[in-house]
């Protein structure tokens, strides 16, 4: 069995990993799964999307998930179950309001001799309270800041 999980949190524009993750996700989703020549290959695809709005905060939350599983027959020497299962999934969540924007995305790939239970998909219901109620410190201007005099440290 092999498994790759790739996570990335984008908290500000210009994140150097954002392009790499998008590129990786596109490659992973477009990659042909399974044995293309197998006549008995079975494929299952799932697409889900959910949205929440918070009028009191002028905020929105979105979650989308795409998952594809392919299986095909294989000799018993390769797989005791007689089949190989490959799954690829891409999940993306966004939370935005006038003062902030949070984006998170993850890609997942697995290959196994037996069907694996699906990993838990993040839900907006469990994710948005973290973003919604996270306290932020008030911004201050330079006129309100008091600057301390630099201290010299002598080493001897």
UniProtKB/Swiss-Prot annotation:
Protein known as: Movement protein P17
Superkingdom of the organism of origin: Viruses
InterPro entries: Luteo_VPG
Pfam families attached to this UniProt entry: Luteo_Vpg (PF01659)
Subcellular location: Host cell junction, Host plasmodesma; Host mitochondrion outer membrane; Host Golgi apparatus; Host chloroplast envelope
Source organism of this protein record: Potato leafroll virus (strain Potato/Scotland/strain 1/1984)
Tagged with keyword Membrane: yes
Family: Belongs to the polerovirus movement protein family.
Modified residues (Phosphoserine): 71, 79, 137, 140
Region annotation (Disordered) ranges: 55-80, 131-156
């Amino acid at each position: 069995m092999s498994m790759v999980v790739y996570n990335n949190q984008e908290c500000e524009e210009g994140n150097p990993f954002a392009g790499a993750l998008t590129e990786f996700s596109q490659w992973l989703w477009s990659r042909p799964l399974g044995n293309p020549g197998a006549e008995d290959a079975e494929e299952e695809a799932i697409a889900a999307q959910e949205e929440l709005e918070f009028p009191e905060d002028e905020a929105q939350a979105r979650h989308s998930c795409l998952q594809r599983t392919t299986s095909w027959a294989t000799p018993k020497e390769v797989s005791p179950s007689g089949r190989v299962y490959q799954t690829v999934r891409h999940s993306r969540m966004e939370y935005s309001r006038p003062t902030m924007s949070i984006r998170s995305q993850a890609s997942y790939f697995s290959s196994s001799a037996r069907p694996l239970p699906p990993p838990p998909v993040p839900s907006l219901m469990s994710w948005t309270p973290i973003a919604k109620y996270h306290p932020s410190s008030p911004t201050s201007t330079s006129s309100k800041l008091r600057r301390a005099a630099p201290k010299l440290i002598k080493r001897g």
